[in-house]
Protein backbone atom coordinates (compact mmCIF):
# COMPACT_ATOMS: atom_id res chain seq x y z
CA UNK A 1 0.00 0.00 0.00
CA UNK A 2 2.64 2.66 0.88
CA UNK A 3 4.65 1.70 -2.18
CA UNK A 4 1.70 1.85 -4.56
CA UNK A 5 0.11 5.00 -3.18
CA UNK A 6 3.23 7.02 -2.48
CA UNK A 7 6.44 5.46 -3.83
CA UNK A 8 5.30 4.92 -7.41
CA UNK A 9 3.26 8.13 -7.45
CA UNK A 10 6.22 10.23 -6.35
CA UNK A 11 8.44 8.73 -9.03
CA UNK A 12 5.80 9.55 -11.63
CA UNK A 13 5.47 13.13 -10.37
CA UNK A 14 9.17 14.02 -10.42
CA UNK A 15 9.91 12.45 -13.83
CA UNK A 16 8.78 15.44 -15.96
CA UNK A 17 10.54 17.85 -13.59
CA UNK A 18 13.81 15.95 -13.85
CA UNK A 19 13.45 15.71 -17.63
CA UNK A 20 12.92 19.46 -17.89
CA UNK A 21 15.98 20.21 -15.77
CA UNK A 22 18.07 17.78 -17.81
CA UNK A 23 17.00 19.32 -21.13
CA UNK A 24 17.82 22.77 -19.77
CA UNK A 25 21.17 21.44 -18.49
CA UNK A 26 20.12 22.68 -15.06
CA UNK A 27 22.27 20.47 -12.84
CA UNK A 28 21.31 22.37 -9.69
CA UNK A 29 17.59 22.04 -10.39
CA UNK A 30 17.97 18.36 -11.27
CA UNK A 31 19.85 17.73 -8.03
CA UNK A 32 17.38 19.63 -5.85
CA UNK A 33 14.35 17.87 -7.34
CA UNK A 34 15.82 14.40 -6.92
CA UNK A 35 17.10 15.23 -3.44
CA UNK A 36 13.61 16.39 -2.46
CA UNK A 37 12.15 13.16 -3.82
CA UNK A 38 14.55 11.04 -1.79
CA UNK A 39 13.83 12.90 1.44
CA UNK A 40 10.06 12.91 0.92
CA UNK A 41 10.16 9.17 0.24
CA UNK A 42 12.07 8.44 3.43
CA UNK A 43 9.74 10.60 5.54
CA UNK A 44 6.80 8.43 4.50
CA UNK A 45 8.35 5.03 3.87
CA UNK A 46 10.47 4.55 7.01
CA UNK A 47 7.53 4.80 9.44
CA UNK A 48 5.47 2.66 7.06
CA UNK A 49 8.16 -0.03 7.17
CA UNK A 50 8.41 0.12 10.95
CA UNK A 51 4.65 0.05 11.40
CA UNK A 52 4.17 -2.91 9.05
CA UNK A 53 6.94 -4.88 10.75
CA UNK A 54 5.66 -4.27 14.28
CA UNK A 55 1.98 -4.65 13.40
CA UNK A 56 2.33 -7.52 10.94
CA UNK A 57 0.37 -10.03 13.01
CA UNK A 58 -2.36 -7.60 14.16
CA UNK A 59 -2.82 -6.45 10.57
CA UNK A 60 -2.99 -9.96 9.09
CA UNK A 61 -5.30 -11.23 11.84
CA UNK A 62 -7.68 -8.30 11.46
CA UNK A 63 -7.93 -8.59 7.68
CA UNK A 64 -7.73 -12.32 7.05
CA UNK A 65 -8.29 -14.45 10.16
CA UNK A 66 -11.83 -15.64 9.50
CA UNK A 67 -13.33 -19.01 8.60
CA UNK A 68 -10.65 -21.51 7.63
CA UNK A 69 -7.87 -18.92 7.92
CA UNK A 70 -6.51 -20.04 11.29
CA UNK A 71 -4.35 -18.30 13.87
CA UNK A 72 -1.37 -20.37 12.72
CA UNK A 73 -1.97 -19.25 9.13
CA UNK A 74 -2.06 -15.65 10.36
CA UNK A 75 1.27 -16.09 12.12
CA UNK A 76 2.89 -17.61 9.04
CA UNK A 77 1.51 -14.84 6.81
CA UNK A 78 2.76 -12.22 9.26
CA UNK A 79 6.27 -13.66 8.84
CA UNK A 80 6.08 -12.92 5.11
CA UNK A 81 4.75 -9.42 5.76
CA UNK A 82 7.59 -8.80 8.20
CA UNK A 83 10.26 -9.95 5.75
CA UNK A 84 8.89 -8.06 2.77
CA UNK A 85 8.34 -4.89 4.83
CA UNK A 86 12.06 -4.82 5.61
CA UNK A 87 12.65 -4.09 1.92
CA UNK A 88 10.01 -1.37 1.64
CA UNK A 89 12.50 1.56 1.78
CA UNK A 90 14.54 0.00 -1.02
CA UNK A 91 11.45 -0.68 -3.15
CA UNK A 92 10.30 2.93 -2.75
CA UNK A 93 13.70 4.58 -3.20
CA UNK A 94 14.26 2.59 -6.40
CA UNK A 95 11.00 4.05 -7.73
CA UNK A 96 12.31 7.52 -6.85
CA UNK A 97 15.77 7.03 -8.35
CA UNK A 98 14.59 5.43 -11.61
CA UNK A 99 13.20 8.72 -13.05
CA UNK A 100 16.72 10.17 -12.81
CA UNK A 101 17.70 7.65 -15.50
CA UNK A 102 14.54 7.84 -17.57
CA UNK A 103 14.72 11.66 -17.62
CA UNK A 104 18.11 11.31 -19.34
CA UNK A 105 16.70 8.68 -21.74
CA UNK A 106 18.86 6.03 -20.11
CA UNK A 107 16.79 2.84 -20.00
CA UNK A 108 19.73 0.45 -20.22
CA UNK A 109 21.11 1.05 -16.73
CA UNK A 110 17.84 0.27 -14.86
CA UNK A 111 17.54 -2.96 -16.87
CA UNK A 112 21.08 -3.97 -15.89
CA UNK A 113 20.36 -3.27 -12.24
CA UNK A 114 17.05 -5.11 -12.43
CA UNK A 115 18.62 -8.20 -13.99
CA UNK A 116 21.37 -8.24 -11.37
CA UNK A 117 18.73 -7.92 -8.65
CA UNK A 118 16.68 -10.76 -10.14
CA UNK A 119 19.67 -13.11 -10.24
CA UNK A 120 20.66 -12.08 -6.72
CA UNK A 121 17.11 -12.77 -5.54
CA UNK A 122 17.38 -16.38 -6.69
CA UNK A 123 20.77 -16.77 -5.01
CA UNK A 124 19.50 -15.17 -1.79
CA UNK A 125 16.44 -17.45 -1.82
CA UNK A 126 18.58 -20.58 -1.92
CA UNK A 127 21.22 -19.31 0.52
CA UNK A 128 18.78 -18.00 3.15
CA UNK A 129 16.55 -21.04 2.88
CA UNK A 130 19.56 -23.29 3.40
CA UNK A 131 20.58 -21.16 6.38
CA UNK A 132 17.15 -21.41 8.01
CA UNK A 133 17.05 -25.15 7.40
CA UNK A 134 20.44 -25.47 9.10
CA UNK A 135 19.31 -23.35 12.06
CA UNK A 136 15.70 -24.47 12.55
CA UNK A 137 15.33 -28.00 11.21
CA UNK A 138 16.48 -30.97 13.32
CA UNK A 139 19.00 -33.27 11.71
CA UNK A 140 16.59 -36.20 11.46
CA UNK A 141 13.99 -34.08 9.65
CA UNK A 142 16.50 -33.04 6.99
CA UNK A 143 16.91 -36.65 5.90
CA UNK A 144 13.39 -36.65 4.46
CA UNK A 145 14.29 -34.39 1.55
CA UNK A 146 13.88 -30.73 0.72
CA UNK A 147 10.18 -30.72 -0.22
CA UNK A 148 9.17 -32.78 2.80
CA UNK A 149 11.16 -30.48 5.05
CA UNK A 150 9.51 -27.38 3.59
CA UNK A 151 6.07 -28.93 4.05
CA UNK A 152 6.61 -30.04 7.64
CA UNK A 153 8.60 -27.17 9.15
CA UNK A 154 6.61 -23.91 9.42
CA UNK A 155 8.24 -20.53 8.92
CA UNK A 156 10.88 -21.39 6.33
CA UNK A 157 9.11 -19.16 3.81
CA UNK A 158 10.42 -16.22 5.87
CA UNK A 159 13.65 -16.62 3.88
CA UNK A 160 11.85 -15.72 0.66
CA UNK A 161 10.62 -12.38 2.01
CA UNK A 162 14.06 -11.44 3.31
CA UNK A 163 15.63 -12.49 0.00
CA UNK A 164 13.28 -10.19 -1.92
CA UNK A 165 14.14 -7.34 0.44
CA UNK A 166 17.90 -7.88 0.12
CA UNK A 167 17.73 -8.05 -3.68
CA UNK A 168 15.84 -4.74 -3.68
CA UNK A 169 18.58 -3.13 -1.60
CA UNK A 170 21.12 -4.46 -4.10
CA UNK A 171 19.09 -2.93 -6.92
CA UNK A 172 19.09 0.41 -5.08
CA UNK A 173 22.84 0.29 -4.40
CA UNK A 174 23.63 -0.43 -8.06
CA UNK A 175 21.36 2.34 -9.32
CA UNK A 176 22.80 4.81 -6.82
CA UNK A 177 26.38 3.89 -7.72
CA UNK A 178 25.75 4.29 -11.45
CA UNK A 179 23.87 7.55 -10.92
CA UNK A 180 26.79 9.00 -8.98
CA UNK A 181 29.21 7.73 -11.62
CA UNK A 182 27.19 9.56 -14.31
CA UNK A 183 28.02 12.81 -12.47
CA UNK A 184 24.64 14.45 -13.01
CA UNK A 185 23.52 14.73 -9.40
CA UNK A 186 24.87 16.55 -6.36
CA UNK A 187 23.67 15.44 -2.94
CA UNK A 188 22.32 18.49 -1.14
CA UNK A 189 23.64 19.57 2.28
CA UNK A 190 21.91 18.66 5.52
CA UNK A 191 21.51 14.91 5.07
CA UNK A 192 23.17 13.96 8.36
CA UNK A 193 20.90 16.22 10.40
CA UNK A 194 17.89 15.09 8.38
CA UNK A 195 18.57 11.39 8.94
CA UNK A 196 19.26 11.81 12.67
CA UNK A 197 15.97 13.65 13.20
CA UNK A 198 14.08 11.17 11.05
CA UNK A 199 15.50 8.17 12.90
CA UNK A 200 14.64 9.74 16.26
CA UNK A 201 11.05 10.32 15.14
CA UNK A 202 10.80 6.71 14.00
CA UNK A 203 12.32 5.52 17.27
CA UNK A 204 9.64 7.41 19.18
CA UNK A 205 6.91 5.87 17.04
CA UNK A 206 8.43 2.40 17.34
CA UNK A 207 8.56 2.64 21.14
CA UNK A 208 4.95 3.83 21.24
CA UNK A 209 3.83 0.89 19.12
CA UNK A 210 5.86 -1.55 21.21
CA UNK A 211 4.28 -0.32 24.44
CA UNK A 212 0.87 -0.44 22.78
CA UNK A 213 1.41 -4.06 21.76
CA UNK A 214 2.24 -4.96 25.38
CA UNK A 215 -1.18 -3.66 26.42
CA UNK A 216 -3.16 -4.99 23.45
CA UNK A 217 -4.65 -8.49 23.59
CA UNK A 218 -3.56 -11.40 21.42
CA UNK A 219 -5.09 -10.56 18.03
CA UNK A 220 -5.40 -14.23 17.10
CA UNK A 221 -7.89 -15.00 19.91
CA UNK A 222 -10.12 -11.91 20.23
CA UNK A 223 -13.19 -11.20 18.12
CA UNK A 224 -13.36 -9.12 14.94
CA UNK A 225 -14.46 -5.85 16.52
CA UNK A 226 -11.77 -5.95 19.19
CA UNK A 227 -9.17 -6.51 16.48
CA UNK A 228 -10.46 -3.57 14.44
CA UNK A 229 -10.61 -1.31 17.49
CA UNK A 230 -7.16 -2.18 18.77
CA UNK A 231 -5.57 -2.00 15.32
CA UNK A 232 -7.13 1.42 14.75
CA UNK A 233 -5.84 2.60 18.12
CA UNK A 234 -2.33 1.32 17.44
CA UNK A 235 -2.13 2.78 13.94
CA UNK A 236 -3.67 6.09 14.99
CA UNK A 237 -1.53 6.33 18.12
CA UNK A 238 1.64 5.51 16.23
CA UNK A 239 0.86 8.07 13.54
CA UNK A 240 0.12 10.72 16.17
CA UNK A 241 3.38 10.06 18.02
CA UNK A 242 5.31 10.20 14.74
CA UNK A 243 3.67 13.48 13.72
CA UNK A 244 4.34 15.09 17.11
CA UNK A 245 7.93 13.84 17.14
CA UNK A 246 8.47 15.25 13.65
CA UNK A 247 7.17 18.65 14.74
CA UNK A 248 9.27 18.65 17.91
CA UNK A 249 12.37 17.75 15.89
CA UNK A 250 11.83 20.64 13.51
CA UNK A 251 10.07 19.10 10.51
CA UNK A 252 7.46 21.29 8.85
CA UNK A 253 4.99 20.94 5.99
CA UNK A 254 7.39 22.79 3.72
CA UNK A 255 9.67 19.74 3.92
CA UNK A 256 7.06 17.92 1.83
CA UNK A 257 6.93 20.62 -0.83
CA UNK A 258 9.13 20.36 -3.90
CA UNK A 259 11.83 23.01 -4.07
Per-range role (PLM):
Residues 1-259:
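Membrane-embedded alpha-helical bundles of multi-pass transporters/translocases
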Amino acid sequence: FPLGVFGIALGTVILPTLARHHVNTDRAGFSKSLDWGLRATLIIILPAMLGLMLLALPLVSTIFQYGKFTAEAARMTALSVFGLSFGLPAFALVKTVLPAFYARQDTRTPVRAGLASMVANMVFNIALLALLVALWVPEEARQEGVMATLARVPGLHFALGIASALSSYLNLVLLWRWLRRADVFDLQPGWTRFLVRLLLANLAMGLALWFGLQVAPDFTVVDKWQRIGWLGALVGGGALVYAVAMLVLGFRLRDFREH
